[in-house]
Curated annotation (Swiss-Prot):
Function: Produces ATP from ADP in the presence of a proton gradient across the membrane.
Highest taxon above the source species: Bacteria
Gene Ontology molecular function: any one: ATP binding
Gene3D superfamilies assigned to the protein according to its UniProt record, in alphabetical order: ATP synthase (C/AC39) subunit, domain 3 (1.10.132.50), V-type ATP synthase subunit C domain (1.20.1690.10)
GO CC terms in record: proton-transporting V-type ATPase, V0 domain
Pfam families: vATP-synt_AC39 (PF01992)
Keyword Ribonucleoprotein belongs to the record: no
Protein name: V-type ATP synthase subunit C
Keyword Transport: yes
Length: 323
């Protein structure tokens, strides 16, 4: 193993060559489920596709992503490993928040979109099967995951799901920001600052009309969303989004619901992450690759469901295309 990015980036360049082309997704928008399975079997996901059902597609996507992304920290040591680990920890936060929502709504584990992070699928399944969020924290504590401590602390403050998610993000990003400052990786720091902005926008939408104090949920460390804008958006002042013209978030002007916001944020973060290909000697190339793989997983699951349930193209097209 190497302690810099030269070796890792060489491996990542090869793996980027297995990313699915845009033509795959355009073709898949019109396919039956059987034809979608055939097309998927001819890709890098085919080796893990062991059945003919929707759960088999999800399993193939999850396991392929784990192989092609989850092992990246193990390919390097030192600062390079820590930088990659911070990227994948962000996915662990996503996974924990997704499992908390699934538990609260009775959604089965198989329907949860897990992103490749630092933990195996089996650990997330055990967390899902825990009796309550406190039990989930206990499961995460076994491998010594930092989110276990964060979840325990948050649960001492509130049991409300929206507040739990927001406070988890606050603790997570505060810890990650501290760790990132110690690394000589400007591409990582700049990207994480955008993630903080995105999380603040997301949280403000979720907590609109709650009457809660903004200071308890506002994340420091962003570039474009300050505390004043955060508080205004929590109060329903959508002019905040118009004020972001000239920033990476300019495309959010006019957004009024959480679903549209999530879709817009996903595309903004993907676009900014892909600029990392211009950072061949640092973590930027890995950042671009990780986010491209994530987007690929999201699109595959959505297209599989469109084909399986026979949904019209127009119903999912805007969900699987980033301008």
């Amino acid at each position: 193993m190497a302690d810099d990015f030269a070796y890792l980036n060489a491996r990542v360049r090869v793996r980027r060559g297995t990313l699915l082309k845009e033509s795959f997704f355009q073709e898949a928008l019109d396919l039956s489920f059987a034809d979608f399975l055939r097309l998927l079997s001819e890709t890098v996901y085919g080796g893990e596709l062991a059945g003919q059902g929707l759960p088999d597609v999800d399993r193939a996507v999850l396991r392929t992503q784990a192989k092609l992304v989850g092992d990246l920290p193990r390919l390097v040591t030192g600062e390079a490993r820590e930088a990659v680990r911070l990227l994948l920890l962000r996915n662990d936060l996503h996974n924990l928040q997704a499992l908390l929502r699934a538990k609260a709504t009775g959604r089965p584990f198989e329907e949860v979109l897990l992103l490749p992070g630092t933990l195996r699928e089996e650990v997330w399944r055990q967390a899902y099967e825990a009796q309550d969020p406190a039990g989930m924290a206990q499961v995460l504590a076994v491998p010594g995951h930092p989110l276990a401590r964060a979840l325990r602390a948050v649960l001492r403050e509130t049991q409300d799901l929206a507040r739990v998610e927001a406070l988890l993000a606050k603790r997570f990003f505060e810890d990650v920001a501290k760790a990132a400052k110690g690394l000589d990786q400007p591409a990582l720091r700049d990207y994480l600052a955008l993630e903080v902005d995105a999380e603040n926008l997301r949280t403000a939408f979720k907590l609109q009309g709650s009457g809660l104090a903004p200071d308890a949920f506002f994340l420091k460390g962003g570039r474009f969303v300050d505390r004043v804008r955060f508080a205004r958006l929590m109060e329903g002042d959508y002019a905040v989004l118009d004020e972001l013209s000239g920033t990476p978030f300019s495309g959010l002007s006019g957004v009024r619901d959480l679903k549209a916001l999530e879709r817009g944020l996903r595309c903004v973060l993907l676009k900014e992450a892909k600029k990392g290909v211009q950072d061949p000697l640092g973590v930027g190339l890995v950042l671009a690759y990780v986010k491209e793989r994530e987007w690929e997983a999201v699109r595959l699951r959505l297209l599989a469901r469109r084909a399986y349930f026979g949904l019209p193209r127009a119903q999912v097209e805007e969900e699987v295309v980033c301008p």
